[in-house]
């Protein structure tokens, strides 16, 4: 499913969002990458909340990060799945929350007139407003961006069916982890973003993916973070868990160039097949 050109969309500027950045053993990476990107796009530092694993990490981050470049540091829990759950329970239900990784190097946007049909993203604030507005339009809570920074595969469309919502940058109306509409992740590490995509889709009947913007990041290669725990076995275990627990949506994909096992998402209960 898609919607027409972005040119017809009006932009609201009133979304009271926060940006939650979980980070582990990457204080310098966060300082030099994601925080610099947010500064470049004129994001209010008071909106930026950094979630660390323990008190020791908290002190390291306070000593490393530039004062005034973020709002606050919150001590959460180790491992990305439990930390995502901690973040969901930290904020009020319905709060607009951006989840952002600590190693984002930038963003590109689709432009059919540009070389490779892509250019540097003009406005991150507009993308954030677009995402939350599309969620309201389609009565769902999770939105994300295109996972691959390659204009050849991107387009000026918005998806609202089952799509993989990449974990490095996405937004949601905070669901919490409790109650019939809560979203609680079971996976602690690898493929937690696939699990989140499926759980939101199952709860809401749709997720939003903006095809016209993508992140620049180092998947599977940046030291620290998930790489502290990741092995090919852990990635395979996560992929197999997805197929076992969401057989109506998930299929194992062993053909990715990364060399790591991946998951393909499609709602198999529907007749029409679309690429993820």
Identify the residue ranges that each predicted region occupies:
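Short, well-formed alpha-helical segments that are part of the catalytic scaffolds
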Residues: 21-42, 57-64
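Hydrophobic targeting segments
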Residues: 16-21, 38, 47-50
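A structural signal for short, well-ordered beta-strand segments and their strand-loop junctions
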Residues: 97-101, 141-146, 207-211, 251-254
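Conserved catalytic core of nucleotide-sugar-dependent glycosyltransferases
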Residues: 107-194
